[in-house]
């Protein structure tokens, strides 16, 4: 049973052909789903190449109850953003890295991925179709969610016979509502990943297990949860949806991407930027003791970008860190976002511009 698409009959927000922007209160954007006009869909059989995808009206999809994603969690997702610059361009931040990461994840889960070229082209098409939903400069970004899911029917544990590559978008503001730093709780009871598992790829199955810890932490007033390694329970690894860094003196340290944490694209970029401005960067095991003795702590990720950590609580010990205008994380945030927003020259070659010369006449009607 091949998946089918059902366009939404009642979109929450609207976009008209003659509007530069969709009807959204940009100043009130948070990090919640705002459905846009279109999505991208492509399909392929196991071991074959993906078909040329289509831009279709955003809507529900129907798949077999025996689909691999539903029964065995055979699915991957990515997350990246499109930005609108002051001079009107729309750009993507390092989409080639997301394409490569999806390839790595697909190999781990025995899935057939789109080629890196098709991935990037599909992202461009999807953003172009939804260009009115890219927020004005400084008002947020268009979050892009590529999905690779096993939609073919399987009964026993096996690779799905068919896959769907789908991309949808949503305009977003800040991931965390509070303007101050994060208040993290170290979870000493649950583990996010273990060696030999799937912690190093963006598998759909990695995320629902952290929700219990996250709910418990937020009910106690914390912003998020920091998980420890499964082998010793003594080293820090990853926050629920982002990587973590510590600063002491001139040394910036972050846990290594050795298979149990996600190799974040923002993480990779921050390591490079920190070295550029004269800091030593160490990717190594970091103990809880080192965390508690750090001068600064911050998190990185597509959703959070760079976010300072104000406090960490481990058992009954609570440590406060440097935040604010003088913080190293604030400096890094400005450097990175200036590149992303086109405020400064992109000497890294990280930004990819979307061609505005292509119109939207070929996109299907939403009705």
UniProtKB/Swiss-Prot annotation:
The modification N6-(pyridoxal phosphate)lysine is found at residue 202. It holds the Pfam family Aminotran_4. Belongs to the class-IV pyridoxal-phosphate-dependent aminotransferase family. Its cofactor is pyridoxal 5'-phosphate. PROSITE patterns: AA_TRANSFER_CLASS_4 (PS00770). GO terms for molecular function: branched-chain-amino-acid transaminase activity. This is Putative branched-chain-amino-acid aminotransferase 7. One of its GO terms (biological process) is branched-chain amino acid metabolic process. InterPro entries: Aminotrans_IV, Aminotrans_IV_CS, Aminotransferase-like, B_amino_transII, BCAT-like_C, BCAT-like_N, BCAT_family. Keywords: Aminotransferase, Pyridoxal phosphate, Transferase.
């Amino acid at each position: 049973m091949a998946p089918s698409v059902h366009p939404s009959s009642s979109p929450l927000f609207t976009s008209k052909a003659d509007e530069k922007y969709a009807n959204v209160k940009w100043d009130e954007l948070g990090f919640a789903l705002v459905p846009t006009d279109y999505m991208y869909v492509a399909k392929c059989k196991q071991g074959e190449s993906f078909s040329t995808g289509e831009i279709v009206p955003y809507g529900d999809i129907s798949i077999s109850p025996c689909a691999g994603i539903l029964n065995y969690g055979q699915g991957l997702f990515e997350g990246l953003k499109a930005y609108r610059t002051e001079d009107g361009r729309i750009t993507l931040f390092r989409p080639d890295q997301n394409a490569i990461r999806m390839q790595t994840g697909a190999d781990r889960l025995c899935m057939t991925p789109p080629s890196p070229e098709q991935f990037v082209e599909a992202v461009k098409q999807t953003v172009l179709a939804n260009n009115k939903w890219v927020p004005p400069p400084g008002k947020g970004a268009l979050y892009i969610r590529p999905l690779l899911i096993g939609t073919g029917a399987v009964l026993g544990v096996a690779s799905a016979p068919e896959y769907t590559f789908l991309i949808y978008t949503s305009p977003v503001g800040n991931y965390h509502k509070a303007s101050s730093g994060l208040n993290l709780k170290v979870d000493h009871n649950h583990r996010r990943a273990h060696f030999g598992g799937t912690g190093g790829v963006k598998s759909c199955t990695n995320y629902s297990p952290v929700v219990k810890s996250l709910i418990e932490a937020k009910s106690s007033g914390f912003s998020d949860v920091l998980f420890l390694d499964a082998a010793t329970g003594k080293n820090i690894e990853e926050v629920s949806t982002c990587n973590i860094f510590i600063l002491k003196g001139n040394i910036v340290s972050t846990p290594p991407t050795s298979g149990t944490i996600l190799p974040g694209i923002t993480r990779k970029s921050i390591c490079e930027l920190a070295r550029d401005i004269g800091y030593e960067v160490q990717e190594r095991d970091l103990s809880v003791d080192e965390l508690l003795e750090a001068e600064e702590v911050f998190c990185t990720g597509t959703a959070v970008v760079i976010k300072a950590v104000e406090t960490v609580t481990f058992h009954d010990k609570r440590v406060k860190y440097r935040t604010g205008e003088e913080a190293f994380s604030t400096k890094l945030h400005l450097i990175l976002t200036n590149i992303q927003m086109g405020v400064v020259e992109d000497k890294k070659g990280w930004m990819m511009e979307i061609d505005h010369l292509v119109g939207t006449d070929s996109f299907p009607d939403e009705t």
